Amino acid sequence: MPTHPRHFSITQIGNLASLRIGIKNASKEQSENVLEASALLSGAHIHHKIADNIIAAIWRKYILNCAYNITTARYNRTIGQLREDPETAAQYETLVRESWLVSEAAGAGVPETSINEIIDQFYHKLDPASTSSLQRDIWAGRPSELETFSGYLVRKAKELSVPVLLSETMYSDLQKIVSKQS
């Protein structure tokens, strides 16, 4: 047993992370609670926004993560390396589109314009040296969020009869990599 406590922290790299708060179909009391939470966050100087549609905000972030985490993990490359390769860049774009189609079928309300915004982030805003937590965990043989960023999407797509061929392929490929790393 260690003689000192372990300390953990999260380091934000880049400026694309943002905190959204809200409640789906909030009652008046729940809306007031969201405003109170917002005031607390503001008082602590934590930048955030109240989402008009929290489900759409969650799905939009999920769409980004499905492409970002899956492509970096599958190829064990940085964002810059993915951008430089026309094939992996095109796959990133396809994963964004497939994820959006699932969100649309699920009724999340993510605007279609988000597709190009997320793809634009990939080409112009993400740090070229960026890697993903999924990538680092898989290639280090640690437990990962593969089921969160790929398994769930593939299962939801099947449930909603949405074809996601590349997502299925990447999920299968990553499952094989994970089994070899174990």
Regions found by a protein language model. Name each.
Residues 1-57, 61, 67:
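Rossmann-fold dinucleotide-binding core
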